[in-house]
Regions:
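Membrane-interfacial helix-loop-helix junctions in multi-pass membrane proteins
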Residues: 51-52, 132-133, 184-237, 251
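Transmembrane helix-boundary elements of multi-pass transport/secretion proteins
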Residues: 2-9, 15-87, 115, 119, ...
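Alpha-helical transmembrane segments and their short interhelical loops
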Residues: 100-175, 221-231, 236-239
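Helix-loop-helix units of permease transmembrane domains in multi-pass membrane transporters
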Residues: 80-112
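Short, membrane-interfacial amphipathic segments enriched in basic
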Residues: 1-14, 196-206
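Transmembrane helix-loop junction
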Residues: 43-48, 127, 131, 158-162, ...
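Transmembrane helix segments
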Residues: 41-46, 163-203
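Short amphipathic alpha-helical coupling elements at transmembrane boundaries
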Residues: 12, 16-20, 91-95, 161, ...
Length: 252
């Protein structure tokens, strides 16, 4: 494999973009601080309580708040894409040897990698402060389940970045982030919603991300329905992302 192959170019661009993202300390703090603080607050209130289905309330909250922080990190990477489009960097890349598909894959990889601080720190707080007790295998399985379940949100960040402008991408990202988090049951149990809202919640990818993580952390295996729904969202958003990317290239 030479340094000019699409795979090598994708990896190199993803590495450079990830380094730039991790240098943005403000971005990292904002995507980690709120979910971590909320988890610590609620974990102290509900310590020792049982959520049912082999799950403690603290473990339930740990998955919810980790998902909350990770979704925010993934979606908000769209802001950098919008900035790159405004300054002309995106257009320069289109004229380079980097294929469009490699660019999109690299950006999706970056979106996935910037979610790791929120995931790791909330899980670490769960183990140390929250008293969540899992085997090494359970920690690994739960972490991987939540992380891989974030793929549609990484793609959603790309969609927002290519469809929005520098002026609109931040409010769009925030509304989408909070809307998916609340409606998906990351802040409040979906069971507490009115019946019609419960049905709407089950259409959101955030609901199934939380369901995936909670089912795995409870030791009940991987829920097939959650995987299928998240995969479906990934395919739909991927198609929209490709369309938005191509459309953004036609604008001066």
């Amino acid at each position: 494999m030479t340094a000019t192959t699409p795979v090598a170019m994708t990896a190199r661009y993803a590495l450079i973009s990830t380094r730039l993202a991790y240098r943005n300390v403000r971005f990292l703090v904002l995507t980690v601080a709120l979910p971590l603080l909320l988890f610590l607050l609620y974990a102290n209130l509900y310590r020792g309580q049982d959520a049912g289905d082999g799950l403690t309330v603290v473990a339930y909250l740990m998955v919810s708040m980790a998902s909350f922080g990770c979704i925010g990190a993934a979606i908000n990477t769209g802001a950098r894409i919008a900035i790159e489009r405004q300054v002309g960097w995106n257009r320069q890349l289109r004229l380079s040897a980097l294929p469009g598909s490699s660019y999109l894959v690299a950006k999706a990889i970056v979106s996935m990698l910037v979610t790791l601080p929120a995931l790791i720190l909330v899980f670490l707080a769960g183990a140390t402060v929250g008293g969540v007790q899992l085997s090494a295998g359970q920690w690994l399985a739960t972490g991987l389940a939540v992380w891989l379940g974030l793929i549609p949100f990484a793609v959603l960040g790309l969609v927002i970045g290519f469809a929005g402008s520098v002026d609109t991408v931040q409010p769009i990202s925030m509304i989408t982030y909070l809307g998916l988090s609340i409606l998906g049951g990351l802040w409040f149990p979906v069971e507490a919603f009115p019946e019609f809202l419960q049905q709407i919640a089950k259409l959101t990818p955030s609901y199934w991300l939380a369901d995936l993580g909670r089912t795995v952390v409870a030791g009940q295996g991987v829920p097939t329905e959650a995987v299928l729904v998240l995969a479906g969202w990934t395919l739909v958003l991927g198609a929209v992302g490709v369309w938005a990317y191509r459309r953004s290239g036609t604008k001066v």
